[in-house]
Amino acid sequence: MRKQLGEAVGEVKTDIEIARAARKQPIMEVGARLGIPPEHLLPYGHDKAKVSAEFIAAQREKKNGRLILVTAINPTPAGEGKTTTTVGLVDGLNRIGKKAIVCIREASLGPCFGIKGGAAGGGYAQVVPMEDINLHFTGDFHAITSAHNLLSALIDNHIYWGNEQAIDIRRIAWRRVMDMNDRALRHIVGSLGGVANGYPRETGFDITVASEVMAILCLAMDIRDLERRLGNIIIGYRRDKSPVYARDIKADGAMAVLLKDAMQPNLVQTLENNPAFVHGGPFANIAHGCNSVVATTTALKLADYVVTEAGFGADLGAEKFFDIKCRKAGLMPDAAVIVATVRAIKMNGGVKKEDLAKENVEALRKGCPNLGRHIQNVKKFGVPVLVAINHFTSDTEAEIQAIKDYVRTLGSEAVLCKHWAEGSAGIEELADKVADLADAGHSQFSPLYPDEMPLFQKIEAIAKDIYHASEVIADKLVRDQLRIWEDQGYGHLPICMAKTQYSFSTDPNLRGAPTGHTVPIREVRLAAGAGFIVVITGEIMTMPGLPKVPSSERIRLDEEGYIEGLF
């Protein structure tokens, strides 16, 4: 835990203590400042609400504000404060007189109880109510999990009652999900126990944030688009290898009903009472890593500046933000911010985790090429970029200056940010520079590859241009499957790479800015409803496991019933 503002007088507060002490405004007042009438806010208590679909539809002809992406370098396991910086930047923009909204993802229970913690920011740059957001919030993840598992149940039920669609039980592509890290459920055998329980088959669970239903909710433009996409989900194949869709077993309507309310964005506020949309939550290492299109496009109609994040490093989240979300939603980003920390750069320079707090300018300079590659990669999309140095108390002036000097050699600028400890006052400089950059009109956004490029070449484009790999390794089965999907009319879809977040390569231990490595493809999955091809590389898992000492061991209720240990 880093020391907080006020440490000189011995005042040390945890994230949850800071959040609990926040002076929140009634959510109706937050909405009123955005021009949302109370009848179009569906309240969940006094501090959170959903925005009605009717209000959202009425905003479509309005002019868009500026769109700013916050991404990061390859992180340490604890993360580098990307959400914290996203929230802090919006507070900073509002502090300097700009009308800004933050758009971030909802938290998954997996990392909350695992190693990474929640997704509400930290220190004095948080969205609140932090406890609700990090736990059950408005029930969106429950709805997504329920809709996904309804389809799973309907598949087995369809087979049990005669299998009218002639589904080949060896080729069922749809698994089950739960919002928890549980390695024991990765591969299981279901329907054991006799004839009454159905046909035994191998299956498994993924984490909810890897669900195609999550991706669909985050990419759908409205409820009708949502239902259409749900119907397009491929649940498996027949013996002649023709696909079976969710609509073929009449699952799409009921799934859409379960997701009707979840489709509406959630409005909350920052510690400084600025508006925040928190909606959707796909991971960026095993999914596309962006908040919902509906939340982002709505925010763009209501504010002059919208700041959103994309998960993990720019090799994952930012690439998918540009190549999937912006491509599919017609978004045009105006600027990007790459969050870097001294500790993450030193880790990329070879410093061990236990030594990250010690000054080591030489190792930092050795790790800077990791930051440099992320800067160059973002610029490949035609988007101008700034670097935010998220300050830790262990950082030294020499280390901070070394980062600034390095970034300057690449034609960009790095700005020291202390929003974690000081709130908006600690990020004013970055806010000024980001607003100027976004307003300058320098962005010439273009995706990395065209729609018409063959699928395998799209994979190679990402691997070679973004990861700097020398080769993509895929066996005949993978290549043949990609060609079959092209023949079936799916060749125009973008690629969603599932890869470790800790390295440009598929080896989490290969730090820095490696070149000449290979990218082995283990599996490919067609997410026809979401509208992309998932390419699973290396040892990445779509159902994570818990660490040896999970965060859950520190989470409890105190004697008065208040939560302790959540971060």
Curated annotation (Swiss-Prot):
GO terms for molecular function: ATP binding; formate-tetrahydrofolate ligase activity. Keywords: ATP-binding, Ligase, Nucleotide-binding, One-carbon metabolism. It holds the Pfam family FTHFS. ATP binds at residues 76-83. Pathway: One-carbon metabolism; tetrahydrofolate interconversion. Its EC number is 6.3.4.3. PROSITE patterns: FTHFS_1 (PS00721), FTHFS_2 (PS00722). GO terms for biological process: tetrahydrofolate interconversion. The keyword ATP-binding applies. It catalyses: (6S)-5,6,7,8-tetrahydrofolate + formate + ATP = (6R)-10-formyltetrahydrofolate + ADP + phosphate. InterPro entries: Formate_THF_ligase, Formate_THF_ligase_CS, P-loop_NTPase. Belongs to the formate--tetrahydrofolate ligase family. This is Formate--tetrahydrofolate ligase. It comes from Sinorhizobium medicae (strain WSM419). The lineage of its organism: Bacteria, Pseudomonadati, Pseudomonadota, Alphaproteobacteria, Hyphomicrobiales.
